From Swiss-Prot:
This is NAD(P)H-quinone oxidoreductase subunit H, chloroplastic. Belongs to the complex I 49 kDa subunit family. It catalyses: a plastoquinone + NADH + (n+1) H(+)(in) = a plastoquinol + NAD(+) + n H(+)(out); a plastoquinone + NADPH + (n+1) H(+)(in) = a plastoquinol + NADP(+) + n H(+)(out). GO terms for molecular function: NAD binding; oxidoreductase activity, acting on NAD(P)H, quinone or similar compound as acceptor; quinone binding. Its main location: plastid. NDH shuttles electrons from NAD(P)H:plastoquinone, via FMN and iron-sulfur (Fe-S) centers, to quinones in the photosynthetic chain and possibly in a chloroplast respiratory chain. The immediate electron acceptor for the enzyme in this species is believed to be plastoquinone. Couples the redox reaction to proton translocation, and thus conserves the redox energy in a proton gradient. GO terms for biological process: photosynthesis, light reaction. It comes from the Eukaryota.
């Protein structure tokens, strides 16, 4: 019997949007030829909340609680960039103790972010067990956050000139105990995952980005370092006290999903080293909170003026942003998180431009998935690690 070969028409498939607690409200319009991906178009904007415009109608202190809603899995970094921008613009010096406290909190937040990437990423490619392991360690980090800041998430801990409160009694010892415990758990993750043959078949050679492509697309963070570019803003920009600590930039040369996994594993190890060193050499002195100092001016405080007795009668008495512009950036878990701030001799920013790492890194997704299998889309998308709160802003 003769069989006639018929070419099927391309099929268009809509992936997402999902719930924000899952893969986020990202929609992918995928065109398929059988199982092969021929085109992919990301649709954004489902989680847009106008964060930049809100910033232009708030003082920096009023805006701080909003920024933890960008990347809600690494909120310390959004707080850090929000206070760093006016600090650089107005040349405010941060006490050494406050700088060390910031480093400790940032690196704990980096570990928590990488952990909550690792669990769902493994679940996406068919391994459920690591998801429960990472929640166990992440819970310990959140306990440390709760003891120091009062909040497990959305900490609202950073302040202009320092941090909100000093570390509580006994917190340093608890954090050191966690670091000793977690170092062994990273070894456990590696034994469980890294050399697993099924895992390697799903990630090795999938979503490869060359060194030149990574630079030309403007990628940042571990997307850049996994392609052989040793670029880490903690080393490049010398912010906080990172230069006083001994640690190495983690990088790989292959540029595939496996390389991005290995960089994250390496970064968790380095973060533990940074935290341990910072806890052992953290100096004494003030932790500084400029806004709290304003409140403690006694009876003559500007806060006691009649104009402030009624809500919205007058903006809170805070410092004015000079008529200057400045770009400030930090090395967030997902890449370069930046703020372009323009002051206008007002308590409100004239322009507050957010450079989210996920938005820039997501650009390369259509190129990576073309020619791949449908099942590889979740592997590649997961290896990029995006949070739609910061992508859509």
């Amino acid at each position: 019997m003769t069989m006639l070969a018929a070419k099927a028409d391309p099929m268009t498939l809509s992936m997402g949007p999902h719930h924000p607690s899952m893969h986020g409200v990202l929609r992918l319009i995928v065109t398929l030829d059988g199982e092969n991906v021929t085109d992919c178009e990301p649709i954004l904007g489902y989680l847009h909340r106008g964060m930049e415009k809100i910033a232009e109608n708030r003082t920096i202190v009023q805006y701080l609680p909003y920024v933890t809603r960008w990347d809600y899995l690494a909120t310390m970094f959004t707080e850090a960039i929000t206070v760093n921008a006016p600090e650089k613009l107005t040349n405010i010096q941060v006490p050494k103790r406050a700088s060390y406290i910031r480093i400790i909190m940032l690196e704990l937040s980096r570990i928590a972010s990488h952990l909550l990437w690792l669990g769902p990423f493994m679940a996406d490619i068919g391994a459920q067990t690591p998801f429960f392991y990472i929640l166990r360690e992440r819970e310990m980090i959140y306990d440390l956050f709760e003891a120091a800041t009062g909040m497990r998430m959305m900490h609202n801990f950073f302040r202009i000139g320092g941090v909100a409160v000093d570390l509580p009694y006994g917190w340093v010892d608890k954090c050191l105990d966690f670091c000793d415990y977690f170092s062994l758990k990273v070894d456990e993750y590696e034994r469980l995952i890294t050399y697993n043959s099924i895992f390697l078949k799903r990630v090795e050679g999938v979503g490869t980005i060359s060194r030149e492509e990574a630079i030309n697309w403007g990628l940042s963070g571990l997307m850049l370092r996994a392609s052989g570019v040793q670029w880490d803003l903690r080393k490049v920009d010398h912010y906080e006290c990172y230069d006083e600590l001994d640690w190495q930039v983690q990088s790989q040369t292959e540029g595939d999903s496996l390389a991005r996994y290995l960089v994250r594993i390496g970064e968790m190890r380095e973060s533990v080293k940074i935290i341990q060193q910072a806890l052992k050499v953290i100096p004494g002195g003030p932790y500084e909170n400029l806004e709290a100092r304003r409140l403690n001016q006694g009876k003559d405080s500007e806060w006691n003026d009649f104009e402030y007795q009624f809500i919205s009668k007058k903006p809170s008495p805070t410092f004015k942003l000079p008529k200057q512009e400045h770009y400030i950036r930090v090395e967030a878990p997902k890449g370069e998180l930046g703020i372009y701030l323009i002051g206008d001799d007002s308590v409100f920013p004239w322009r507050w431009k957010i450079r989210p790492p996920g938005f820039i890194n997501l650009q390369i997704l259509p190129q990576l998935v073309k020619g791949m299998k449908l099942a590889d889309i979740m592997t590649i998308l997961g290896s990029i690690d995006i949070i739609m709160g910061e992508v859509d802003r």
